[in-house]
């Protein structure tokens, strides 16, 4: 799409050891997402789609309105940051997906969320 709004997504994930129970195959991860509007007009995040893949290859799809209960409007040069989480039965997995957004003229567009890893620190070299 030519003239598509310029939106950048950055993600940092981390293992939440205090809420995890490895002996019961429960691994809790959190991730902080920063959505930046690099364009000249405001954009609004309306919904999300996630594809979560655990270490055994089992996939779970999650979709819904907004993020953390919000549908933020992001001004030009602005950003929106939030933290959320995922629970898996393996110590390693990935997440990826896209955001459903609209531009200042209410035209819908998608912003891809690049694949990122969820892993306990001892598995990362």
Curated annotation (Swiss-Prot):
Disulfide bonds: none
Domain ApaG: 1-125
Gene Ontology biological process terms in this record: error-free translesion synthesis
Record InterPro entries: ApaG_domain (IPR007474), ApaG_sf (IPR036767), Uncharacterised_ApaG (IPR023065)
Gene name of the record: apaG
Organism for this UniProt entry: Pectobacterium atrosepticum (strain SCRI 1043 / ATCC BAA-672)
Cross-referenced PANTHER family: F-BOX ONLY PROTEIN 3, POLYMERASE DELTA-INTERACTING PROTEIN 2
Official protein name in the record: Protein ApaG
Pfam family, one: DUF525
């Amino acid at each position: 799409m030519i003239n598509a709004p310029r939106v950048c997504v950055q993600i940092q994930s981390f293992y939440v050891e205090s809420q995890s129970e490895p002996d019961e195959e429960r691994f809790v991860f959190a991730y902080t997402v920063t959505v930046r509007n690099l364009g000249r007009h405001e954009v609004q995040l309306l919904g999300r789609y996630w594809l979560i893949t655990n270490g055994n290859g089992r996939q779970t799809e999650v979709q819904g309105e907004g993020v953390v209960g919000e549908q933020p409007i992001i001004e030009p040069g602005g950003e929106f940051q939030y933290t959320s989480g995922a629970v898996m039965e393996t110590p390693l997995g990935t997440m990826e997906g896209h955001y459903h957004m609209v531009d200042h003229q209410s035209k819908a567009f998608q912003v891809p969320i690049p694949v990122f890893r969820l892993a306990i620190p001892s598995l990362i070299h």
